[in-house]
Amino acid sequence: MGMPMDVYTIRHGESEANVIIKAGETGDNSLFTQDNVTVPDRSWRLTATGRKQADCIGRWLVSQQPLFDRYLVSPYVRTRETAATMALPKAKWEETRVLRERSWGEINTITQDDFRSNYERNWIFKRTDPLYWRPPAGESIADVAENRVHNLLTSLNRRAEAESVVMVTHGDFMLSMMLTLEDLSDEEFLRRADAQQWRITNCTCLHYSRRDPHTGRTLSRFHWEQTARPILDKATGRWDVEVEDWREFQRPVLSNGDL
């Protein structure tokens, strides 16, 4: 048994729900209609922009690694549409519920005003404790990390030793994977949660590897990560992929003074 050599984890493209929520964040609640707020979270589809993002990251991914050993996808419509639009050659996708969206419970697709007025204390905790905060009847980031991410990694350790794996999932699941694979402290997670550079935008790809990208040596644990994300050139209307440098990380060990 052993871990995969490479894991490419991709967030779905822009969805219909993303558009509604973004509008609400700017004070426009006109899209929170009765028809929209009763749509099950699993049923939201990609927008035209989301399909362009998926096509863009798919073409980049093929240029990096044309074929994978294992293809995993969340069963939600927006992730399945993203995976299909990426058009990876010879892909054989396995749907797995472990990759599903974090549960937002009772506040899924409600306005910020409704959230604040109906769940005032919970609304405060969302801002002050984003790692352990749970939406009413929902999941925290820590819940997803300790349960579903660990289940996924255990399964991959049993079934996918030294393989290359591609997964299409959701933003908060990817945050939970980052938390787990990089053994982030609570403080480091909170720092990243507040930083623009760590945002997992639609169709962002986090590539984790056990192979040193500079020397080719391999380790038993994931030790390197590279981020890629689709970026729209507003002048030309074209989508291109912005690729960051590789990051090396290791499990932090703390002294008494550090604690």
List the model feature ranges, each with a label.
Residues 36-45, 123-141, 248:
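Short glycine/proline- and acidic residue-enriched helix-loop micro-motifs
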Residues 23-40:
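A solvent-exposed, charged loop/short amphipathic helix patch at secondary-structure junctions
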Residues 133-157:
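Internal catalytic-core helix/loop-beta-alpha segment
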Residues 171-175:
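GST superfamily/GST-like fold recognition
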Residues 1-10, 16, 20, 25, ...:
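Acidic, low-complexity terminal tails and accessory targeting/binding regions
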Residues 6-10, 72, 163-169:
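Beta-strand elements within well-structured catalytic alpha/beta cores of enzymes
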Residues 4-8, 15-17, 22, 48, ...:
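Phosphate-coordination/substrate-recognition cap region in phosphate-metabolizing enzymes
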Residues 64-67, 156-163:
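Glycine-rich phosphate-binding loop signature in dinucleotide/nucleotide-binding domains
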